[in-house]
């Protein structure tokens, strides 16, 4: 068989695999939209659904113009400076399939942040921070970890602590970035009207539709099989000295570790919340499942299945504990996004530094070559190199996102374009900003049903 023909078939199969993974990750936007809509009150459902669409359309332009260049362009270990507006793509390193896959990741970050500031944010602010986050803040972090010359990258020439940080599919790059950005947005805006009473006690504001939350969670679960296993980028790569194994083996194992971590976190949250609140809560369980997925995303390709179970177990308690602290400090995040994506994402980075297996690290980053020595998890005898790199990544992301997104939200607040007025918040963003409710038939007769009625009621 002609070798060039074989190479073409291999490249085609790998391109199809990457494109299919990109489609799966994009399906997560639908999952996010359903999850967010069900987690807010009915009077804000249209608003939160629209923000998910905006994340995709605004993120498309910002990532095309600047984001991909900052993330994967050749320049220095901090930020890229080529491939602006996809100039010189396809290249020897990247093609259009890779861009599409990375774009799907970028818009997920903005979706995470949107959840933290739901039900009280002006629509203009969404446009501004979504463009900035997907076009600059997130791509810089992606460059650190995922480009070939990033200063934290496990693929760079000069490895931090002889290891580089392992964040295979983005517990830090995607979820911690989105969670910390959402944290600062929520801090600057403050709690929703009525979230805490005059004595500082929390007032329950449940989402209006558990059905949407459950369906959205299952869609996200489905999409995660593109998010984590898809991060190999290529499936048809054979490992030397292992004729029957290749990336296809690691892809399958990654799907298994992802499933086990999310499932374990869901079960622990089910019983943990039952002990705390006295009933079985579907919404809490869904967030627990997602917390497990977020945590395993960093080390999904480099840990054993049994370790993934431990990852999910701890992720559930991280989420439960952070939610308790959030109420104690009067922190209001309608979707628990900062706690879920920020807290569980941070745990995922630490977990990888503890339990990464050297054999799997070589498979994920060196195509299974055995003559290379790679630091592995601290608990598995791999020394402090990888663990130290994971801690540096965690702290660097927190500092970077805080220094960029914190001032942005503060500036938007000072300009008066971040938070809506109390009257608009009480009426709901759907009627005050979008011309009508998402569910007209479910509204009480005393409430305005259309934007014109809302204006007349405001003038009375």
Swiss-Prot record:
It holds the Pfam family Ammonium_transp. It is a multi-pass membrane protein. Induction: Highest expression in darkness. Leaves. Keywords: Ammonia transport, Membrane, Transmembrane, Transmembrane helix, Transport. GO terms for biological process: ammonium homeostasis; ammonium transmembrane transport. It is found in: Membrane. Disulfide bonds: none annotated. Belongs to the ammonia transporter channel (TC 1.A.11.2) family. This is Ammonium transporter 1 member 3.
């Amino acid at each position: 068989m002609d070798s060039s023909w074989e190479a073409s078939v291999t490249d085609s199969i790998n391109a199809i695999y990457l494109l299919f993974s990109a489609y799966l990750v994009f399906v997560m936007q639908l999952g996010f939209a359903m999850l967010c809509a069900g987690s807010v009150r009915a009077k804000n459902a249209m608003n939160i659904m629209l923000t998910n669409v905006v994340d995709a359309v605004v993120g498309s332009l910002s990532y095309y113009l600047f984001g991909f260049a900052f993330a994967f362009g050749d320049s220095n270990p901090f930020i890229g400076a080529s491939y602006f507006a996809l100039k010189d793509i396809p290249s020897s390193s990247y093609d259009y399939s890779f861009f599409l896959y990375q774009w799907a990741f970028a818009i997920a970050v903005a979706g995470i942040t949107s959840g933290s500031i739901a039900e009280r944010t002006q629509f203009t602010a969404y446009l501004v921070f979504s463009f900035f986050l997907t076009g600059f803040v997130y791509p810089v972090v992606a460059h650190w970890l995922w480009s070939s010359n990033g200063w934290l990258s496990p693929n760079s020439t000069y490895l931090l602590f002889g290891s580089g940080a392992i964040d295979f599919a983005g517990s830090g790059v995607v979820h911690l970035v989105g969670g910390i950005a959402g944290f600062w947005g929520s801090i600057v805006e403050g709690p929703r009207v009525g979230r805490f009473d005059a004595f500082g006690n929390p007032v329950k504001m449940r989402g209006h539709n558990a059905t949407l939350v459950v369906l959205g969670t299952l869609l996200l679960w489905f999409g995660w099989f593109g998010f984590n296993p898809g991060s190999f980028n290529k499936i048809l790569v054979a490992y030397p000295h292992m004729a029957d194994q290749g990336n296809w083996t690691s892809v399958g194992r990654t799907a298994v570790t992802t499933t086990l971590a999310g499932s374990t976190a869901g079960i622990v949250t089910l019983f943990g919340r039952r002990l705390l609140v006295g009933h079985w809560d579907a919404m809490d369980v869904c967030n627990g499942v997602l917390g497990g997925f977020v945590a395993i995303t960093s080390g999904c390709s480099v840990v054993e299945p049994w370790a993934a179970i431990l990852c999910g177990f701890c992720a559930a308690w991280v989420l439960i504990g952070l939610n308790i602290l959030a109420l104690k400090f009067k922190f209001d995040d309608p979707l628990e996004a900062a706690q879920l994506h920020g807290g569980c994402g941070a745990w995922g980075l630490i977990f990888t530094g503890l339990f990464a297996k050297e054999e799997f690290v070589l498979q994920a980053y060196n195509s299974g070559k055995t003559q290379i020595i790679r630091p592995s998890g601290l608990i598995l005898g791999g020394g402090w190199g990888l663990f130290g790199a994971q801690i540096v990544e965690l702290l660097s992301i927190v500092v970077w996102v805080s220094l960029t997104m914190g001032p942005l939200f503060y500036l938007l607040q000072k300009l008066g374009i971040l938070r809506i007025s109390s009257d608009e918040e009480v009426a709901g963003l759907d009627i005050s900003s979008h011309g009508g409710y998402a569910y007209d038939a479910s509204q009480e007769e005393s409430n305005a049903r259309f934007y014109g009625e809302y204006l007349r009621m405001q003038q009375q």
